[in-house]
């Protein structure tokens, strides 16, 4: 099964990993307070101590030229199956939105916080998508909150924006 490995750190440190591993498809982005690098592969990763996710639904290809929103969705063992079933069965008509590039639904290897990556041409295109019924009905905090479990036992639903690095 294809996996997505993610690590956070300084731009320089992560960029050096990328330079030292030209045979691996490593994607590096800038976040608000850090840099992030990820590798999507069926094989072994070069990243040390990454967060590990199994890719359970994918559309399109990753590119370092796109804007991404990573949505972290907390769940519990009691709700994870239902959450996963709901997200797998979502009609992927969101691919028709202007600027849409890619989508990944990820199951955590450890824990119960799922992750979704939405790739768009830029943040403006993503913000337009966030105003849609497709987003509000299937991916918003309100739409997914009943899969979170009891409060205090989980991390929060949140978004992290990943920007292309302009060199």
From Swiss-Prot:
Signal transduction protein, which is a major regulator of staphylococcal pathogenesis. Phosphorylated TRAP leads to the activation of agr system and consequent RNAIII synthesis resulting in the expression of several virulence factors. Up-regulates the expression of most toxins and genes known to be necessary for biofilm formation. It comes from the Bacteria. Each of the three conserved histidine residues contributes to TRAP phosphorylation. Phosphorylation is essential for TRAP activity. The modification Phosphohistidine is found at residues 66, 79, 154. PANTHER family: SIGNAL TRANSDUCTION PROTEIN TRAP (PTHR34474:SF2). This is Signal transduction protein TRAP. One of its GO terms (biological process) is heme catabolic process. Belongs to the TRAP family. Induction: Constitutively expressed. One of its GO terms (molecular function) is heme oxygenase (decyclizing) activity. Keywords: Membrane, Phosphoprotein, Virulence. Residues 67-158 form the ABM domain. Its main location: membrane. It is found in: Membrane. PROSITE patterns: ABM. GO terms for cellular component: membrane. Coiled coil: none annotated.
